[in-house]
């Protein structure tokens, strides 16, 4: 009995440590989704998206707050991309003549990629694939909503499905907007800065709220006006890669500021990080808005549409990891 208790406590401790870091926390994910809803509503002249901003903000938190509770082993690797690991392997294969410089391995399906690049484990991240798989589902739902002869009850069911899938896509997109979610040095463990992950995305963002809200809205409006035309001509994968690359470029600055700023001096720390947080949340919201916009060409029926799901059913990845993939150390992993 004692052995079982010790084992249970050990597993619980591992689970708590590996799950403890959520990109942007509740506030950041919710804010980015609400901003995206505003952008889509304005650009499509459909108030439906703005009126459902609360719903979308909630669903944007579902992958962390709901799905990780029941499907952690197959879910957690979908929340990040350790880009350095991928880049090193791609470069090596190009040098060995095993990969053409013109090939983009990210365009492969999850199953094909896992087969060809079996030495890049799931715990290096599968965020790009998660978004693309869910976007296919969002498109299928949008296609059904375009039909004109659907009964009201069925249309409402499909509208709820659209909101849920769109919202959870938002979670993975905004994960990619977080610099510490696109690097193997995700918690500063490689630079003797453990704890920087939750300090940046949880503590700092929580302290910045609510003053940060309007700043993110304004920055997103500016970016949307500037980039929306160019974004419309790019694939979702291209948008994700650009978003992740821009996130990675902010990493050194975050680590530098962390070393210079005492974490317990929150009054100073929040102002040190404010510009970066605003930029990253706005960048994520804009990419998310463009993805939603592509699947918004249908007419909502808002007549007594009160549907809401507190705990949406888990949506499986196309290829779940063959066996549970524990985090490599007690250090929090996205």
Language-model features: locations:
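SAM/dcSAM-binding transferase cores
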Residues: 176
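N-terminal, motif-rich segments that launch catalysis or mediate targeting to/interaction with membranes
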Residues: 21-164, 168, 179-334
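Bacterial N-terminal signal peptides
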Residues: 5-16
């Amino acid at each position: 009995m004692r052995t079982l208790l010790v084992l249970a406590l050990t597993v619980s401790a591992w689970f708590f440590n590996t799950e403890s870091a959520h990109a942007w926390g509740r506030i950041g994910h919710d804010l980015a989704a609400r901003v995206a809803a505003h952008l889509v509503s304005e650009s499509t002249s459909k108030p439906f998206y703005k009126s459902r901003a609360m719903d979308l903000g909630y669903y944007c938190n579902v992958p962390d707050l709901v799905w990780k509770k029941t499907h952690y082993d197959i879910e957690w690797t979908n929340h990040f991309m350790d880009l350095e690991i991928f880049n090193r392997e791609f470069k090596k294969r190009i040098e060995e003549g095993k990969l053409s410089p013109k090939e983009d391995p990210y365009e492969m399906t999850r199953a094909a990629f896992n087969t060809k690049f079996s030495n890049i484990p799931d715990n290096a991240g599968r965020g790009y694939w998660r978004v693309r798989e869910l976007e296919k589902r969002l498109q299928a739902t949008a296609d059904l909503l375009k039909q004109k002869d659907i009964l009201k009850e069925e249309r409402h069911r499909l509208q709820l499905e659209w909101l849920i899938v769109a919202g959870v896509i938002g979670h993975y997109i905004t994960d990619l907007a977080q610099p510490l979610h696109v690097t193997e040095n995700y918690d500063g463990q490689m630079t003797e800065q453990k704890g920087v992950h939750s300090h940046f995305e949880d503590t700092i963002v929580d302290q910045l709220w609510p003053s940060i809200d309007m700043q993110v809205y304004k920055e997103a409006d500016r970016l949307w006006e500037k980039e929306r035309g160019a974004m419309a001509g790019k694939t979702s994968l291209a948008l994700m890669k650009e978003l992740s690359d821009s996130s990675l470029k902010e990493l050194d600055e975050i680590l530098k500021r962390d070393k210079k700023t005492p974490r317990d001096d929150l009054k100073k720390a929040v102002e040190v990080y404010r510009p970066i947080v605003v930029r990253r949340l706005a960048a994520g919201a804009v990419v998310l808005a463009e993805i939603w916009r592509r699947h918004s060409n249908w007419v909502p029926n808002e007549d007594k549409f009160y549907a809401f799901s507190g705990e949406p059913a888990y949506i499986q990845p196309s290829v779940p990891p063959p066996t549970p993939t524990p985090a490599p150390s007690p250090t929090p992993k996205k």
